């Protein structure tokens, strides 16, 4: 894993490649976490994470689902939803005038397990009916793209 300074240098100079998880339960609700840090601070956002150097997509998917959902899941069990571009005017370090650019590989999956406690990225998780998430101004616009 990169140091904070090296990670910031990457954010300054390159797009990040990440996996977003569009997680649904048996009722069709979508899982969102309340973000506590930039670039999507104070918004509801889907779980996900950046892919690390030399990490295969399958390895990244298993690591990200372990971190976000509490168990490693197989990418083959998810449905690939497409490639998205996310541009933010802010960054994780809060340094002014440095935005964050993500190239996102969105995957949809069903999950009926117990949710893990909140982490340094999210203060809490909640299940949303898709129509209510689309209408909620606190759900980030990038997440609404997945639900429209």
Regions found by a protein language model. Give the residues of each.
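Compositionally biased, intrinsically disordered linkers/stalks adjacent to structured regions
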Residues: 37, 147-148
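Short, charged/polar surface micro-motifs in flexible loops or helix N-caps
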Residues: 24-30, 38-40, 52, 85-89, ...
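Conserved Nudix-box catalytic region and its N-terminal flanking loop in Nudix hydrolases
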Residues: 29-72
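Conserved beta-strand and immediately adjacent loop positions that scaffold enzyme active sites
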Residues: 20, 29, 124
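Active-site segment of metal-dependent pyrophosphate-handling enzymes
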Residues: 17, 70-114
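Acidic, metal-coordinating catalytic segment for phosphate/diphosphate chemistry
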Residues: 1-20, 24, 96-97
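NUDIX/MutT-family hydrolases
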Residues: 106-110, 116-147
């Amino acid at each position: 894993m990169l140091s904070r300074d090296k990670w910031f240098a990457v954010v300054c100079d390159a797009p990040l490649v990440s996996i977003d998880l569009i997680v649904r339960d048996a009722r069709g609700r979508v899982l969102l976490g309340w973000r506590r840090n930039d670039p999507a601070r104070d918004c509801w956002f889907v779980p996900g994470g950046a892919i690390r150097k030399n990490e295969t997509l399958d390895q990244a998917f298993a690591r990200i689902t372990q971190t976000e959902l509490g168990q490693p899941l197989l990418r083959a069990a998810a449905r690939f939803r497409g490639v998205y571009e996310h541009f933010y005017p802010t960054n994780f370090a809060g340094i002014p005038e440095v935005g964050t650019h993500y190239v996102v590989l969105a995957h949809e999956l069903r999950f009926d397990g117990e949710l893990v406690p909140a982490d340094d990225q999210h203060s809490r998780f909640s299940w949303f009916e898709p129509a209510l998430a689309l209408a909620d101004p606190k759900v980030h616009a990038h997440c609404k793209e997945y639900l429209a």
